[in-house]
């Protein structure tokens, strides 16, 4: 499971050092894909494969939106293996999509990581901070 917020820097070659505490969970490979809110999602490879199998089994191939989603997901996914220093190389397209600059934020999102441009993360936090309690009540209802 992935929790916490970290602030690694993106180097000139597009490499990002993953937080040390997550490296063991990602050592078997990881999948980087576009996510919501112009961020990137980083999934452990095995868990991503399970997710894709479930999505593929349930997707209604006759539905144009389902086909578009699957097509986009497959096209925007990049398999990576962290190097000895725990770095991954983010593609130019992923860096463009997430507007990544040198200053980045990596957040734990329970089952996966998110990579954000630092300013975009700050803006997102400011926009949603006041609504956190209301959103948790609405999204989680009686669970909490």
UniProtKB/Swiss-Prot annotation:
All residue ranges annotated as the SpoVT-AbrB domain in the record: 5-47, 77-120
Keywords: Cytoplasm, DNA-binding, Repeat, Transcription, Transcription regulation
MF GO annotations: DNA-binding transcription factor activity; transcription cis-regulatory region binding
Pfam family, one: MraZ
GO biological process: negative regulation of DNA-templated transcription initiation
CC annotations in GO: cytoplasm; nucleoid
Subcellular location: Cytoplasm, Nucleoid
Subunit structure: Forms oligomers.
Family indicated by similarity: Belongs to the MraZ family.
Protein name as annotated: Transcriptional regulator MraZ
UniProt source species: Mycolicibacterium vanbaalenii (strain DSM 7251 / JCM 13017 / BCRC 16820 / KCTC 9966 / NRRL B-24157 / PYR-1) (Mycobacterium vanbaalenii)
